[in-house]
Each structure stands twice: as C-alpha cells, then as structure tokens.
C-alpha cells in the first residue's frame, strides 16, 4: 500500500472517529487531532503505524503515547483550563506539544533525553510551531517561566512533584499519572490558593518520570 498524504488523511479521520466512539467528546481536542499530522512525528519507515491506537517506541526507552491516552489527558486539561500557558513535562516526539499548540495554548515543554529533545526541536522549527523547549529535569518544572495555567506530565511519578504544584497559577491544574512503575492512576490536581484538590481517574501504564522529584534512574532499571 502506498502511504500518500491522502491515505494518512483518511487514517487520521478514522482515528478521530475512534476517539469519539471511545468517549472523547471535547470538540477542541478532536479538532486538534484532526489538524495535527501525527505521522510526521514518527520515523518515515514507521509512519504506517502512526494512526494505530497504540503506543509506539521512539527510542531511548521512551514512547509516543497511544492517541486515546493523549486525547484523554488533553481533555482533562482542556475541560478545566481553556486557554493560557501550559507546561508539558516529557516532550518525547513533540506530538503532544503540537496538539496543545493547535488548541491555542502557549506551550512550554521539557525533555531530559538530549537526542529526543534535538529531534523534537527540529520538528518544531520545521513546522513553525511556536513551542518553547528546554533540555532538563522536567520534575523540577521551569521556574523562570512560571506560573503556568496547567502542567501536563507525560510520564509516571510515584507522587506529585512539589515543584510542579508550586509553579501552578491559582485555579491552575496538574494532570499527571501517579502510582507504581507498572500501573498508574490518571490524576488531576487543582490549585485553589494554597489548597490542592485531587481527583483520580482511569488507570494507565506510562514510562517513568526520571528526575529529582520522580523516579531515580536506578529504580527504572531494576
């Protein structure tokens, strides 16, 4: 089968319909998934898998999350914070950043793996995406750019990083998978002054958040 842009367009429409059937109802999220060409965030030799509803390895022990997972997290954020500054922890391929940008957010993103950071930065420049990217420990956030209206963490942490909570604006929210190394519960923490309200949702399986306020690298390997 020849994977032309028209074929990818059709697969992308099918993906969005699948998300709708799976319960993703936020119209802005669905529109962004229809707009952003997910296959351009895959290596050319693997683009045929871009619209499968599955996570896919992108090297260095990291993955691009399955479309449903990205849409679910983005919906939790968008339902609470319709606009403003968003910090993404774990740039990966850059796809989640592109989705947030398509929805009109001002996006900041941090990646700890230098090779992935370089690849994502190249995509942002190639597609003229106004995303601010930084190489570093995402569990510590980006204090120089704080406060953020929302923080979205694309890796699993044993507990909510205090630094990320402190970088939220009032009424801002942190979307993060919390739990063990194998299974985590998607969690939304909303800031109300100095009070942080926690809501728990479905279970997922994410790669671990490595960093000062996440897992240690030795724990990841054990």
UniProtKB/Swiss-Prot annotation:
Catalyzed reactions: [protein]-L-isoaspartate + S-adenosyl-L-methionine = [protein]-L-isoaspartate alpha-methyl ester + S-adenosyl-L-homocysteine
KW Phosphoprotein (keyword) present: no
UniProt xrefs under SUPFAM superfamilies: S-adenosyl-L-methionine-dependent methyltransferases
Cellular location(s): Cytoplasm
Record GO biological process: methylation; protein modification process; protein repair
Entry's Gene Ontology molecular function annotations: protein-L-isoaspartate (D-aspartate) O-methyltransferase activity
Class of enzymatic activity (EC top level): transferase
Record flagged with keyword Cell division: no
Record key words, sorted: Cytoplasm, Methyltransferase, S-adenosyl-L-methionine, Transferase
GO cellular component: cytoplasm
This enzyme's EC code(s): 2.1.1.77
Main location: cytoplasm
InterPro entries: PCMT, SAM-dependent_MTases_sf
First and last residue of the signal peptide: none
Active site: 65
One Pfam family cited in the UniProt record for this chain: PCMT
NCBIfam families recorded: pimt, PRK00312.1
Functional description taken from the UniProt entry: Catalyzes the methyl esterification of L-isoaspartyl residues in peptides and proteins that result from spontaneous decomposition of normal L-aspartyl and L-asparaginyl residues. It plays a role in the repair and/or degradation of damaged proteins.
HAMAP family from the UniProt entry: PIMT
Family: Belongs to the methyltransferase superfamily. L-isoaspartyl/D-aspartyl protein methyltransferase family.
Name this polypeptide is given: Protein-L-isoaspartate O-methyltransferase
Organism: Chlorobium luteolum (strain DSM 273 / BCRC 81028 / 2530)
Gene designation: pcm
